[in-house]
């Protein structure tokens, strides 16, 4: 890696770490951690399938599109994680403790955030009245991943950006 790129990366990592530590410390209250843990768990695959299942029944076209979106996102972010191999903050730093078990080894990008934003964009385009709830949930989930010690802010920002793009693309095929 060229020296100028390495220097920029090092500055970015330092900023990421400062923000991750600040958010992690700010939420050092057991009740808040428990609430954010519940929010984070709501972004797990079984919950997404529990949402997509009824969609397949209510509106098969939207349900199938949501399934395809989820599959496409997996195909995007798994190789990125394998390529970047970024350690999770709770693994790399002793002062950041994981308040939940990470779903995989690497942190970049945040798959939970990617899926939450992608589905929020898609479902908001389908049912605009749900947009505040869906976008609010996606933002809360993204914050929870940093607070709980399993992601850096840049992980969730990258996940959100990818999810926004894939969700917007998928929304073009809504009936």
Predicted features and spans:
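N-terminal transmembrane-helix/juxtamembrane module of multi-pass inner/ER membrane proteins
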Residues: 1-47, 77-103
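Residue-level signature of the transmembrane alpha-helical core
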Residues: 35-38, 53-54, 67, 135-139, ...
């Amino acid at each position: 890696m060229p020296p100028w790129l390495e220097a920029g990366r090092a500055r970015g990592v330092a900023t990421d770490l400062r923000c991750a530590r600040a958010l992690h410390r700010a939420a050092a209250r057991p009740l808040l951690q428990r609430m954010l843990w519940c929010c984070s768990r709501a972004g797990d695959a079984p919950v997404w399938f529990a949402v997509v299942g009824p969609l397949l029944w209510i509106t098969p076209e939207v349900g199938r599109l949501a399934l395809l979106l989820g599959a496409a996102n997996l195909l995007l972010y798994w190789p990125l994680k394998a390529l970047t191999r970024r350690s999770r903050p709770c693994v790399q730093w002793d002062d950041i403790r994981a308040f939940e078990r990470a779903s995989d080894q690497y942190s970049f990008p945040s798959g939970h955030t990617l899926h939450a934003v992608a589905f929020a964009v898609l479902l908001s385009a389908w049912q605009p009245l749900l947009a505040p709830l869906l976008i609010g949930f996606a933002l809360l989930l993204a914050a929870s991943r940093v607070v709980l010690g399993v992601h850096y802010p840049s992980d969730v920002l990258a996940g959100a950006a990818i999810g926004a793009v894939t969700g917007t693309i998928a929304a073009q095929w809504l009936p």
